[in-house]
A protein has these predicted regions:
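Conserved donor NDP-sugar-binding/catalytic core segment of glycosyltransferases
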Residues: 109-140
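Short aromatic/hydrophobic "clamp" motif used to bind/position activated sugar donors
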Residues: 97
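Acidic donor-binding/catalytic loop of UDP-sugar-dependent glycosyltransferases
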Residues: 61, 102-116, 192
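A conserved acidic beta->alpha catalytic loop
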Residues: 41, 55-63, 104
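Hydrophobic helical membrane-anchoring modules
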Residues: 3-5, 9-17, 192-262
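Acidic helix N-cap motif at the loop->helix transition within catalytic regions
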Residues: 33-37, 60-68, 109
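Short, well-formed alpha-helical segments that are part of the catalytic scaffolds
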Residues: 30-44
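Conserved donor nucleotide-binding strand/loop of the catalytic core
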Residues: 49, 63-91
Length: 262
């Protein structure tokens, strides 16, 4: 009798977890060149319940392109990835938040893997592995293999980074206070706090990450990808690291938060 009750309770728990709504939050800034393709691909991923694009004040056609998608909600607020993702999280309706950068593409079964991971009540969040892919204009053939050095981090680091399509239970995200609205390393800072809240999993599937940043400054990007996290752990502030990096995320005018639902 007890075994039967436990079986039904476990089945019910799995059923509830599988019904979790997933809200995708995508921070963008001047992404007109790629946002249409990214959203088209994202809409083909089964099992995603909500897509929110949070624009940080683009000066190109990014906002107009996003508005052309009836299934996507557009939010506009001040620039800064942490601020933008927090704004999206406040508006999201799902029980799970999936933070997706504009140069990252999900595998077709991403939602199923997320829900499967969260059937374990001890799991508070997780991320995917990465696989960097070159842009069409890769200048030198030998740069291609170097792209994948960054992919090693996603397999062996215990702390997920933002380009790994991080996901987290909504209640846990808000309990932790969301992302710190700092200039750089907001993803690593949040992951450190998330690890203290419970178990973090790495899904055995890869997201595709554009190699555009690497191709623009290959040596500098490799150094930054390896050294900056270490410097941050040693106490160098996100603002200082952003100044060294050039803080390419920032730009455009600062606007008051607003939301447009299509």
């Amino acid at each position: 009798m007890m075994a039967t009750w436990q079986h039904h309770a476990e089945a019910r728990r799995i059923e509830v977890m599988q019904s979790l709504r997933i809200s995708v939050i995508m921070p963008v800034l001047d992404e007109a060149a790629r946002i249409r393709r990214q959203l088209q691909e994202l809409l083909e991923v089964e099992g995603l319940d909500e897509i929110l694009v949070v624009d940080g004040g683009s000066t190109d056609d990014t906002q107009q392109i996003v508005r052309s998608f009836a299934e996507v909600s557009l939010l506009v607020g001040p620039p800064g990835r942490g601020r933008q993702m927090n704004l999206g999280a406040q508006a999201a309706k799902g029980e799970v938040l999936l933070f997706l950068y504009a140069d990252v593409s999900l595998p077709p079964d991403a939602a199923a893997w997320i829900r499967r991971s969260l059937t374990d009540p001890a799991v508070v969040g997780g991320a995917f592995r990465t696989w960097h892919v070159p842009e069409a204009n890769m200048p030198r053939a030998w740069l291609g293999p170097l792209l994948h050095l960054a992919d090693l981090r996603s397999r062996y680091s215990g702390l997920p980074y933002g380009d790994q399509a991080m996901f987290v239970r909504t209640r846990v995200f808000h309990a932790l206070g969301g992302f710190r609205e700092q200039d750089l390393m907001e993803d690593l800072e949040f992951s450190r706090r998330l690890r203290q809240a419970g178990k973090i999993v790495t899904v055995p599937r890869s997201v595709l990450v554009s190699g555009r940043r690497f191709q623009a400054r290959p040596v500098y990007y490799l150094v930054a990808d390896r050294v900056f996290p270490l410097l941050y752990r040693l106490g160098v502030s996100g603002s200082k690291l952003a100044a060294w990096y050039g803080n390419p995320r920032e730009g455009g005018g600062s606007k008051s938060p607003s939301v447009e639902s299509q």
